[in-house]
Structures are given as C-alpha cells and as structure tokens.
Amino acid sequence: MKILITGSHGQLGTELQRIIATWVAEIGKVSDNIKNAEVVAVDVDKLDITNLEQVKEVLNKEKQDVVINCAAATNVDGCEANKDFAFKVNALGPRNLAMVCEEIGAKIVQVSTDYVFRGVGDAPLNETDIVAPVSSYGKTKLWGENFVREFASKYYIVRTAWLYGYKGHNFVYTMMKLGKDKESLSVVNDQLG
C-alpha cells in the first residue's frame, strides 16, 4: 500500500508521519496494513492542492492507494479575514484531490472539523447531527466535505475537534507555555469537545 499525506509540515500531517514511522499511536497500535505502507508526505511547496494541474501531476506520478488530506487553512480568524483563500484551500483543494483520486482509483481521507456544526448546545456532538456552520472556516470545510462526496466514490471524512500534539500552536501547547509564565490562568469552561 502507498499513502500520500498532504499538509505534511502541519500539526496533523507531522503527527501522522510519526505514528506511521513508529507504528504506535496514543490510542493503540497501528494496523499491520499501515505498518508496511510506503508513505509519501508532501507540503504546499511540493503540492499546492488548489492547483488542479499540479494535483494531477503529483498523484499520477506517485500512484498512491490512499490520499490523506491534512492540508488546510485552519486559522479560524484568518479564514474570516481572507474568505477567498479559505475557500480555495478548504473547499477547492479537497475537490481537486477527490477528482484526481477518482480518476486513478485511490481512496481519499478528508480531514474536516467540528466547526461544520453550529457550536451551540450542552451535549457532545454526533456525526449525524445537522451541519450548520457559522464561520467562514466551518463553511469552507463543509464545502470541502461536500466536494469529496460529490467527486470521489471511495472516501472517508474525519471530523476532528481540539487537535493537539507535539508540534504546532494548540490549546495544550498554549496552556503549558502560559503556565510557565503566569501564576494563574483563566480559561473558558463551557466548551464541549
């Protein structure tokens, strides 16, 4: 099996590479199918997913069985400030990958977000809950999901929430850094994840 990971320098792409290389994840062991896989990891400098011709070129060259799309515009405030960029990366990029995956017979794993939901309520979300994004980030990620459903016949959509890891600026990283610098911290306590 050959796996292509996009967004390889980001938080999730980096962690996926580590998990596959070490065969161990925080939640348990990695499948034997994955252990023997050849992994090709690319970032925007090698594969701009918003460029359909480049997607065709790279995916046809690599001949992967599975594409895991970790490439995304994830800065929520940045997506509000630059909606066109967010749409290109979070919607058109997955569309391009899905179209080419369908042409070459590869599966696509589209990483999405809980921001596709409204973000209100007092109970944890379920994947069957109604989607109704309120932010540009959530809307563009939902467009990406819908494009994958429309253009690929072999796909998985994984909605994440509260990603954290050894790389990147995330909630855990921020709290640990602030904990070293401050005597006390105040954080919201009304969010479910």
Write out the residue ranges for each language-model feature.
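N-terminal Rossmann NAD(P)H-binding glycine-rich loop of SDR-like oxidoreductase domains
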Residues: 1-26
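SDR active-site strand-loop-helix element
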Residues: 6, 42, 67-71, 108-113, ...
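Short mixed-charge
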Residues: 24-36
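Rossmann-fold cofactor-recognition segment
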Residues: 38-53
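NAD(P)H-binding glycine-rich loop region in Rossmannoid oxidoreductase-like domains
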Residues: 49-89
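NAD(P)-cofactor binding segment of oxidoreductase domains
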Residues: 81-109
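Catalytic helix-loop patch of NAD(P)-dependent Rossmann-fold dehydrogenases
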Residues: 88, 92-96, 116-158, 162-163
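NAD(P)-dependent short-chain dehydrogenase/reductase
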Residues: 146-193
